[in-house]
Amino acid sequence: MLSPHGVVNTVKRRLHRDIVVDPVLHGLVLNLYLNGERYPHRVDDYFPLAAATDAEIEELMRRHMAEEDRHIALYAKAIQKLEQPVLELPLPDVYNEVIRSHTTASFAIVASDDADARGLKLAHFFGHLHFLEKRIARSLEYHVEACAHAVCSYPEKAVAAVLRDELRHVSYTRDVVRHLLPAGEAASVLSLHAGAERRANLDFSARQLGRLLREQASRFPRMRGAFYRGCTSILRGALTCA
C-alpha cells in the first residue's frame, strides 16, 4: 500500500505527464518556471549585494544571478520550440512573490541599517532562497522525468540544465545562512522560511492548478481532470490548517 508521500509522488508524476504531452499546457507551465527566474529583475531587493561584506558570498550571489539569467534564456527557447508565447505573468502569479506573502521577514536594505541588521536581512534572503530553490528543484525532478514524453525534445534538455544548477543552489544557500548567524539564530531563520514556503506551496499549487483546470479544461483527460479538481480542494483545505 502506498504511503501518503507515495500517493503525492504518483499524482505529481501523472500531472506532469499530462501537462507535457500538450504543447499549450507545457508552455504555460514552463512560463511559470521562467517567471520565477525573471523575478529578480522585477523587484528592487533581491540579491542584496550591498549587504554582503564577505567577498565569497558576494561572488556566490553574482554567479547565482548570472545562472538565473541563463535559465531565462533556456526556458524561453524551450517555450518557443513548443511554438508557444513567452509570457510575463502578474507578480502574484510568481512563486517567489507568493512565498514572500506568507512571511513578514524583510531583506530590503535601508540606509539606517547597521551591520548586524544587514547581516540578518541577508540571512533572511538566503533562507527564503534556500526553500524556494529546494521546492523548485523537486518540481523540476518531476518535470524533467515527464519531459521524456513531450512533443519536443528540447524542453527536457533545458530543464535538466536548470535542475543541475538548482540542486547546487539548494546546498550553498543553506550554508550561507549558517555562516552568517550563530547556530540557534540560523535555525530560527531557516524554520521561519520553511514554514512560509510550505504554506506558499499549498497556496500557489491550488491557484495555478485550479486556473489551468478552469481555463484549459478540454486539454486534460476528463476523469483525471475531475481528480485534479479534487486535489485543488484538498490543497485549499490544507492551507487553512498550515
Label every model-predicted segment.
Residues M1-A242:
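Non-heme di-metal
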